[in-house]
């Protein structure tokens, strides 16, 4: 930790800071320099409340912390999964944007299995910008996704949008998904962590690596031990559908598996395919893809949904 001293820091500032460091970090080491103070040998989890207290002192400019100090669990966590074997290649999670009818979803699930998918998107709940848009089939679709798993043998990935949904999904789905809109929904993160289930967490548009890893830190702190980071992009209109630099930064700073969602920020299925290829080239461990037998008939997001045939070709080429 590096505490930057301002122009008007004086002996009183340093004395107050020394006292504060002793209160928050007993047994730590503090090296006072001309324009900064370096603090080491402290427990990272005690630092979150120290920072605002230190920055409130007259003469303190700002406090700089490394990712390992702010996100000790996320940075030290290992690539771990009892569902996927990452040693055998990239992982492809695919399925419709939302579950609609039993006939459509089961037909699609069978086709995705044949295409080489490793897991199924089982989207029962859909957070939408408009309150009038289709919000997902909800728990009425529980039997549908259960049948899909029985038929295909593939694990299920289901987005949660409310803390009350989680206990109902334990034992039904295999991986909880935290969507980009809810990356900062901290009560949802806590409850997902308490479930002990594997969690895939997307990065919110324009969120920093620090913010993304802090959200993963919530999941790990509250009980999840298997986390997948998923880069989602910064929205339609961005230079690239997925932020490739963010994928590279996540891979550099943590050993957690890093996936990409190439569809949601892509302007069409063709652009989504290109984004998928680019994400894998930058080292992504897997992809979360929207794929349908007939995308033009999809209830939601058909525009950037791949066909099963396109997905099969992608898996064959990039697995």
Model-derived segments and spans:
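N-terminal amphipathic alpha-helix/helix-capping segment at the start of soluble metabolic enzymes
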Residues: 65-93
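Alpha-helix-loop-beta-strand connector modules within alpha/beta enzyme cores
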Residues: 134-158, 192-198, 246-258, 304-319
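Catalytic alpha/beta core domains of metabolic enzymes, predominantly
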Residues: 195-294
């Amino acid at each position: 930790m590096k505490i930057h001293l301002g122009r008007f820091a004086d002996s009183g500032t340093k004395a107050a800071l020394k006292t504060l460091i002793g209160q928050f970090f007993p047994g730590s080491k503090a090296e006072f320099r001309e324009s900064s103070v370096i603090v080491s040998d402290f427990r990272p989890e005690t630092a979150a409340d120290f920072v605002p207290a230190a920055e409130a002192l007259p003469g303190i400019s700002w406090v700089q912390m490394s990712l390992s100090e702010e996100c000790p669990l996320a940075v030290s966590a290992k690539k771990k999964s009892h569902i996927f074997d990452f040693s055998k290649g990239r992982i492809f999670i695919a399925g419709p944007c939302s579950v609609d009818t039993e006939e459509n979803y089961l037909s699609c699930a069978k086709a995705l299995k044949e295409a080489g998918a490793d897991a199924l998107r089982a989207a029962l709940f859909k957070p939408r910008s408009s309150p009038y848009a289709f919000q997902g089939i909800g728990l009425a679709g529980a039997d549908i996704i259960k049948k899909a798993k029985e038929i295909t043998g593939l694990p299920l990935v289901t987005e949660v949008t409310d803390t009350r949904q989680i206990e109902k999904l334990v034992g039904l789905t295999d991986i909880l998904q935290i969507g980009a809109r809810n990356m900062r929904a901290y009560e949802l993160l806590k409850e997902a962590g308490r479930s002990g289930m594997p969690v895939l967490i997307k990065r919110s548009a324009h969120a920093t690596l620090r913010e993304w890893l802090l959200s993963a830190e919530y999941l790990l702190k509250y009980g999840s031990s298997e986390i997948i980071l998923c880069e989602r992009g910064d929205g339609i209109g961005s230079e690239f559908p997925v932020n490739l630099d963010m994928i590279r930064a996540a891979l550099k700073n943590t050993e957690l598996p890093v996936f990409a969602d190439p569809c949601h920020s892509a302007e069409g299925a063709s652009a989504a395919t290109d984004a998928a290829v680019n994400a894998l080239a930058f080292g992504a461990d897997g992809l979360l893809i929207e794929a349908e037998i007939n995308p033009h008939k999809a209830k939601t997001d058909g525009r950037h949904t791949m066909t099963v045939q396109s997905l099969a070709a992608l898996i064959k080429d990039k697995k």
